[in-house]
């Protein structure tokens, strides 16, 4: 079950799990996270099974489009199918929206074969659930190169349209866009 959590629990979640689950360059600092949480710029959700919190994610909504960030299964529940059930629940939870966007590290970010394998498995995880990799978008956030994967509830968008949606979402949440570089390989007509 997906449950939206309040500010205090969201801040506790950061300290308890996010710091361990995400490298420093892939998560906001605690100060930035607290500011976003207090200002209601994003929503924090936990995913529970049998009354236990087994996973969590952050979502940001703009014009019926959802960006999912920092999705993670809590370490002791990994390898038990929780991630698949979580992703299916998220897809169902947002079924009245236009699309879901997720960011997955680009294969360029791998420093070794083990990291490359993890990145490939992460992409496959999303694609097996129906997400499509949006090729032709260059997307770098806080110096991390990402691939964009999209689950469409509506007609597929062009790279330019999707790029504009992502810029719009991040502009609302993080108006200082110095650390976001995103562009489409399509020409604006």
Show which residues each predicted segment covers.
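A short, internal acetyl-CoA/4′-phosphopantetheine-binding micro-motif in the GNAT/acyltransferase core
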Residues: 71-78, 106-108
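C-terminal "cap" of GNAT-fold acetyltransferases
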Residues: 119, 132, 138-189
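Conserved GNAT acetyl-CoA-binding A-motif
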Residues: 94-118
């Amino acid at each position: 079950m997906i449950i939206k959590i309040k500010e205090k629990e969201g801040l506790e979640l950061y300290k308890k799990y996010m710091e361990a689950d995400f490298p420093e360059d892939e998560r906001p600092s605690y100060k930035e996270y607290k500011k976003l949480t207090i200002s209601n710029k994003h929503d924090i959700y936990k995913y529970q099974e049998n009354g236990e919190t087994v996973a969590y994610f952050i979502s940001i909504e703009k014009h019926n489009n959802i960006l999912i960030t920092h999705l993670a299964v809590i370490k002791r529940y990994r390898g038990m199918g929780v991630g698949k059930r979580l992703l299916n629940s998220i897809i169902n939870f947002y079924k009245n929206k236009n699309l879901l966007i997720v960011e997955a590290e680009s294969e360029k970010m791998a420093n070794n074969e083990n990291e490359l394998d993890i990145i490939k498995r992460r992409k496959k995880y999303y694609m097996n659930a129906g997400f499509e990799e949006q090729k032709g978008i260059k997307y770098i956030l806080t110096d991390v190169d990402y691939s964009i994967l999209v689950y469409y509830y509506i007609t597929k968008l062009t790279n330019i349209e999707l790029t504009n949606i992502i810029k719009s979402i991040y502009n609302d949440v993080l108006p200082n866009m110095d650390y976001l570089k995103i562009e489409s390989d399509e020409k604006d007509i």
